[in-house]
Amino acid sequence: MFRFMRDVEPEDPMFLMDPFAIHRQHMSRMLSGGFGYSPFLSITDGNMPATRPASRRMQAGAVSPFGMLGMSGGFMDMFGMMNDMIGNMEHMAAGGNCQTFSSSTVISYSNTGDGAPKVYQETSEMRSAPGGIRETRRTVRDSDSGLEQMSIGHHIRDRAHILQRSRNHRTGDQEERQDYINLDESEAAAFDDEWRRETSRYRQQRPLEFRRHEASVGGGRRAEGPPRLAIQGPEDSPSRQSRRYDW
């Protein structure tokens, strides 16, 4: 335990296994003056950690138990971890030869004791596939204002069709909005068909065991396929009852 509390050398194997060693070393440089940017770096004897190659620091982060999660900076740098994760997702998506999925959720809770607790929740998801195909989803629930909102966007490179629906369970107000990016409203149906054709190539097949079980339960007859998700129009709008917006 005492060994971990002192500043060890980067070559020490214990340094590589201690997730807080890099943080302590950084603090030591800051307290020694100059915040790690000494004007005399060029004439040091080479023992100063800041003058060593970056590969040594990268190696230490890689061996650290939390290094791969972006937590090697000490105290579990959550913002750094999120930035690294988003950067890795964008890098993989830009490669054009993989499918990616990312999701983030923010929840705020407060209870002052003079009423019902206030909860705010926001979730964002993104799925991507080769060819610049993306699906974005965003949901918001705010107990204070009574707002519930959901938006789904389909993207093909720089074109997008975004459908957003919201309601207020306190006032009963409902709203629907459609946004088009580099599209005309008359091109929306053709764009949706193109998006479904492109995404159908990447749908996962169900396991063989599941198909066998389904066939045995259904007397040898299988369903034509899993049900498609859909957002249907409001029931109080007769003009939209026959409309089906498949996602």
UniProtKB/Swiss-Prot annotation:
Keywords for the protein's UniProt record, in alphabetical order: Cytoplasm, Nucleus, Phosphoprotein
Predominant location category: cytoplasm
Bias type Basic residues, positions: 154-169
Pfam families: Mlf1IP
Biased composition (Acidic residues): 182-192
Record's keyword annotation contains Protease: no
Any one Gene Ontology cellular component term annotated for this protein: glutamatergic synapse
Composition bias, Basic and acidic residues: 134-144, 170-179, 193-225
Modified residues (Phosphoserine): 216, 237, 239
Locations listed in the record: Cytoplasm; Nucleus
Region (Disordered): 122-247
Highest taxon, organism lineage: Eukaryota
Keyword hit for Chloroplast: no
Family affiliation: Belongs to the MLF family.
Protein name: Myeloid leukemia factor 2
Gene this protein is translated from: Mlf2
